[in-house]
Structures are given as structure tokens and as C-alpha cells.
Amino acid sequence: MSPITTLLIGIAMSTDAFAAAIGKGAAIGKPRLRDALYVAVIFGVIETATPIAGWLLGQVASHYIATFDHWIAFGLLGGLGIHMIVNGLKNNGNTCKDNADTHNRNSRWLTLAATALATSIDAAAIGISMAFLDIHIGIVAAVIGLCTFTMVIFGVMLGRVLGTFVGNRAEIVGGIILIIVGSTILYEHLSNTG
């Protein structure tokens, strides 16, 4: 596989994470670079690991996973999106910063990890498909992880601008973005099979 093809795969696999990061940045309100790096590391590590896991699973049972991966991504992203919307509606009078500060640190980590996992299901599917090609999965996974890391930093910081415009409703916007990403994954799969 050529370096250009590998880079294009990395960019394509990181677009869902980029969209989710915009929502996360909006929910944080005024994220600092440190916040963006924290989110980017979690997304980057998970996005690096999932193609490797997919590749390993592809060695064993590729068609079983490919039949339902889109439903897993849709369910996780949709559920997280609904959760964010409900929280945004409950905390109507609070600022985004207040909301971010009151969340438990472990809860934030788990939410980030679940979001990263949901957006990386497609990378796992890529890993499965690459199990049948003569490629070095470590290089492809590293490129996907680095692209995701970079795009998530930009996404979180772009979410800062979005958060300024939407104010207290930023968490709702983030939830809507996650639902759109999950629905897009499901739609793309169903439209390709129908």
C-alpha cells in the first residue's frame, strides 16, 4: 500500500472523531490546549488500537463482525448523543464551563473513551479488511492514530468557537453531532448494501 493511500485512509478514519471532538469542544465551552490534548490522546490511542484489533479479528471471523459493526457504532453514538442532549436540557441555567467542572473525572474519561470507541468502529472494520491484504497493520494503525490525534485537537479547539455561539446549549449541539455521526455511519453502510 502506498504512503499516500495510507495517509488517505488515516484521514478518512479520523473524520468521525473530528466531528465528535467539535461537539466535545463545544460542550467544554472554552477548552484549553491541555483539554484538546487530553481528548486527542484518548481518541488517538483508541483509534490506533481498533484497526489492530480488527485485523486480529479479521484473521478469525471477518464476515461475522462486518454484518453488525455499523449497528454498534450507531447505538453507542446515538446513546451518548441522547445522554448529552438530556444533560444539556437538565442543566439549562448552567454555563458549559460549570457543566464540565461538575462532571466526575472518571465519568468524563469513560464518556470520552466510549465516544472514541464508537467513532473507531469503522477503523476496526478497516483492520478486518486489511487482514486479507499484504500490508503492515502497525504502520496503517499508527497513521490512523496520528491523523486522529491531530484532527481531534483541531476539532476540540473549533468546538470552542461553536461553544461561544451556542452558549448554554453547547452540550445539546454536541449530542446532536454524535447522533448525526452515528446515523451517517448506519446510513452509509445500509446504502452500500442495499
Curated annotation (Swiss-Prot):
The membrane-spanning stretches of this chain are 3-23, 37-57, 65-85, 112-132, 137-157, 170-190
Coiled-coil residue spans: none
What InterPro entries does the entry give?
Mntp/YtaF, Put_MntP
Query: What is the recorded membrane topology of this protein?
Result: Multi-pass membrane protein
One annotated GO molecular function? manganese ion transmembrane transporter activity
Question: Which GO cellular component term is one of those annotated?
Answer: plasma membrane
* Location of the protein in the cell: Cell inner membrane
Entry-linked Pfam families: Mntp
Entry keywords, A to Z: Cell inner membrane, Cell membrane, Ion transport, Manganese, Membrane, Transmembrane, Transmembrane helix, Transport
**Is Ion transport included in the keywords of this UniProt record?**
yes
Q: Mainly localized where?
A: membrane
Q: Does the keyword Oxidoreductase apply?
A: no
Role, per record? Probably functions as a manganese efflux pump.
By sequence similarity, the record places it as follows:
Belongs to the MntP (TC 9.B.29) family.
PANTHER family, per the entry? MANGANESE EFFLUX PUMP MNTP-RELATED
Protein name in the entry: Putative manganese efflux pump MntP
- Whose protein is this, by species? Xylella fastidiosa (strain Temecula1 / ATCC 700964)
